[in-house]
From Swiss-Prot:
<feature type="region of interest" description="Disordered">
    <location>
        <begin position="180"/>
        <end position="276"/>
    </location>
</feature>
<dbReference type="InterPro" id="IPR000095">
    <property type="entry name" value="CRIB_dom"/>
</dbReference>
<dbReference type="GO" id="GO:0004674">
    <property type="term" value="F:protein serine/threonine kinase activity"/>
</dbReference>
<keyword id="KW-0067">ATP-binding</keyword>
<feature type="compositionally biased region" description="Low complexity">
    <location>
        <begin position="217"/>
        <end position="227"/>
    </location>
</feature>
<dbReference type="GO" id="GO:0019236">
    <property type="term" value="P:response to pheromone"/>
</dbReference>
<comment type="function">
    <text>MAP4K component of the MAPK pathway required for the mating pheromone response and the regulation of cell polarity and cell cycle.</text>
</comment>
<feature type="domain" description="Protein kinase">
    <location>
        <begin position="361"/>
        <end position="612"/>
    </location>
</feature>
<dbReference type="InterPro" id="IPR011009">
    <property type="entry name" value="Kinase-like_dom_sf"/>
</dbReference>
<dbReference type="InterPro" id="IPR033923">
    <property type="entry name" value="PAK_BD"/>
</dbReference>
<keyword id="KW-0539">Nucleus</keyword>
<keyword id="KW-0723">Serine/threonine-protein kinase</keyword>
<feature type="binding site">
    <location>
        <position position="390"/>
    </location>
    <ligand>
        <name>ATP</name>
    </ligand>
</feature>
<feature type="compositionally biased region" description="Low complexity">
    <location>
        <begin position="254"/>
        <end position="266"/>
    </location>
</feature>
<dbReference type="GO" id="GO:0005737">
    <property type="term" value="C:cytoplasm"/>
</dbReference>
<keyword id="KW-0808">Transferase</keyword>
<keyword id="KW-0589">Pheromone response</keyword>
Length: 642
């Protein structure tokens, strides 16, 4: 019996261990489906992930069990995928319909260049190629001044795209206001710009652009330190027992590429005093301690060593800064927050006169139409004085922030040779700006229908220069001096207009004011997109003087693109029958039309020129004004009859 038991035990130990059969319940039966094949979802099948092949055993190779587990029901259909499987299948398994939205605010950018090897312009659209062919600029002229061609084409493109319409809003970029001009709580647009730094009358000659910021070096930047430096952490107090660190000071921390946080300008920078009895370890040699240090003492010594290393770095950088000038730190240009329509309206309400302007002015008569509103003549109720009113829809103004600055500057620019600002109102959605009305019209009609003498030309130049000198002293560049913007009274008084508010109240449509961006009065530095200052107004005055001589400015009969080319390349324009002019007049024009702005005269210089001594009285211009009005009325009648 014992032998039989031993044999059974040896057989049992030699046989491989097998899983005991699954217990069958009374309601279970063999699975009629046979072998169970694991189904894969469509998403995993589509992925064809090799990990699935290696991680999961092959179902076909596994031994099948004909018995079902007790939790399986008989004859049940395959269960549907759960919610998670359906979600994965919808994301990965099924193809997604790609929906591409339409572009928003598309901008077509044209990059024009010139290839010196081929002698051809690159990046020219077909429209520009046709324009260049029809401009009248020969191939030889293009090859002689390729860079000038690129500059003027970019200039013309910018004006043709509509960007030139906003130029009028930048006349006051440099304006200087007296202290306390702004109402409380207002933060109007800055009166200065990077192109025109803040200036005074003596320094506002030819501003230069700021030099480009230095390029960052490949190595880690060294922060520029001031004379007072705040360490990252205050050095701890020395321990009671004088101890020397058992190891040399650690290496200085590597300066990270992240720039340190800027400190507010008004925050005082102070350095905490260092106790006199605290030793400073700089390059201290290692010394074996005489006693075992506690963890607290060791931590304190490590902090002291770190503070000493930082102090050593600071001392070296201070010595270096004293011997070498510190490199300029490039600061990002601050961006002025764009005011909302609500903010602009709130600021305008603070500076505009309250009340209903329709009760103060009556008999409004429309005499002109601008891009954002109309120009009317009206009469003041109390004085019966005729005024000009510009009604502007604020929603159509491209530069709402600058309107506030211009109103404040115009209030401070009272001058006898400037069409003065009288009042402003907010009426509904419109801004009403009330200005002086010059019933004589513009100088354009005078030069078109009359021949002026040198004395009369000198009188116009003197009055214009007087107004320009006042504007320049305020930091204002007019940038659009021409006969259209010189208005006269019936008595011959002369005043400058068009400062953003005053539209062309002359309703005549001619080549001067209908063509977009025709720069016949512009200085060469404007056409070639260079930095410029107040001397651009002096050049325009010289061109206007030629206009009074010949009846039109130079190059008026040329195409706009060729006019740009001639202004940029010819320099001082030639005057027809220049020999018929007096020497003093020729010298006056020569000083005003210098190509180099540095050598061009200022308004102050030209007011002292001998040409001013031959000025005729202003009332001598009254007959010319009346004659021009009659001729203009007859011309309108003829056009109307035809």
């Amino acid at each position: 019996m014992s032998l039989k038991k031993q044999q059974q035990q040896s057989d049992f130990s030699a046989a491989p261990a097998r899983r005991p059969p699954t217990l069958q319940s009374y309601h279970t039966s063999p699975d009629p489906r046979g072998k169970q094949i694991l189904r894969q979802s469509a998403s995993f099948t589509a992925l064809n992930n090799p990990r699935m092949d290696t991680a999961l055993p092959q179902i076909q190779d596994a031994p099948s069990n004909s018995k079902r587990n007790s939790d399986e029901g008989f004859g049940t259909k395959p269960r549907r995928k759960n919610t998670f499987s359906s979600f994965v299948n919808s994301v990965l398994g099924s193809p997604r319909n790609i929906k591409i939205s339409a572009p928003e605010n598309p901008v077509h950018v044209t990059h024009v260049g010139y290839d010196n090897q081929t002698g051809q312009f690159t990046g020219l659209p077909k429209d520009w190629q046709r324009m260049l062919q029809a401009s009248g600029i020969s191939k030889k002229e293009q090859e002689q001044h390729p860079q000038t061609m690129v500059d003027i084409m970019r200039f013309y493109e910018r004006n043709a795209a509509g960007a030139g319409d906003e130029e009028v809003w930048h006349k006051f970029d440099n304006a200087i206001l007296r202290q306390g001009e702004y109402p409380d709580g207002m933060s109007p647009a800055s009166a200065t710009s990077p192109r025109f730094p803040q200036n005074h009358e003596g320094s506002f000659e030819n501003p230069r652009a700021a030099p480009p910021p230095p390029k960052p070096s490949q190595s880690s930047p060294v922060p520029v330190l001031s004379s007072t430096i705040v360490p990252n952490r205050v050095a701890p107090k020395p321990p009671t027992v004088g101890l020397i660190p058992s190891r040399p000071p650690p290496q200085p921390p590597v300066v990270s590429n992240r720039a340190p946080a800027a400190r507010p300008a008004n925050e005082p920078v102070t350095t905490p005093p260092i106790p006199e009895n605290e030793p400073v370890f700089v390059n201290a040699p290692p010394v074996v301690p005489s006693a075992i240090q506690s963890p607290v003492q060791y931590q304190q010594q490590q902090e002291r060593a770190m503070a000493a290393a930082q102090q050593a770095i600071i001392d070296k950088q201070l010595d270096r800064s004293r011997s070498q000038p510190a490199a300029a730190v490039a600061r990002p240009r601050p961006r002025t927050r764009q005011s909302t329509a609500f903010d602009v309206r709130a600021k305008l309400q603070a500076i505009c006169t309250p009340g209903d302007p329709t009760k103060k002015y009556y008999n409004l008569n429309k005499i002109g139409q601008g891009a954002s509103g109309g120009v009317f003549t009206a009469y003041e109720t109390n004085t019966n004085k005729c005024v000009a009113i510009k009604q502007m829809n604020l929603d159509l103004q491209p530069k709402k922030d600058l309107i506030i600055n211009e109103i404040l500057v115009m209030k401070d620019s009272k001058h006898k040779n400037i069409v003065n600002f009288l009042d402003s109102y907010l009426h509904g959605l419109d801004l009403w700006v009330v200005m002086e009305y010059m019933e004589g019209g513009s100088l354009t009609d005078v030069v078109t229908f009359n021949i002026m003498s040198e004395g009369q030309i000198a009188a116009v130049c003197r009055e214009t220069l007087s107004g320009l000198q006042h504007l320049h002293s305020k930091g204002v560049i007019h940038r659009d001096i021409k006969s259209d913007n010189i208005l006269l009274s019936m008595d011959g008084e002369i005043k400058l207009t068009d400062f953003g508010f005053c539209a062309q109240i002359n309703d005549s449509q001619n080549k001067r004011n209908t063509m977009v961006g025709t720069p016949y009065w512009m200085a060469p530095e404007v056409v070639t997109r260079k930095e410029y200052g107040r001397k651009v107004d002096i050049w325009s005055l010289g061109i206007m003087a030629i206009e009074m001589i010949e009846g039109e400015p130079p190059y008026l009969t040329e195409s706009p693109l060729r006019a740009l080319y001639l202004i940029a390349t010819n320099g001082t324009p030639k005057i027809k029958d220049e020999q018929n002019l007096s020497p003093v007049f020729r010298d006056f024009l020569h000083l005003a039309l210098r190509v180099d702005p540095e050598k061009r005269a200022s308004a102050h210089d030209l007011l002292k020129h001998p040409f001013m001594s031959i000025c005729e009285p202003l009332n001598s211009l009254a007959p010319l004004v009346k004659s021009a009005r009659i001729s203009r009325a007859q011309e309108k009648a003829q056009k109307g009859g035809a």
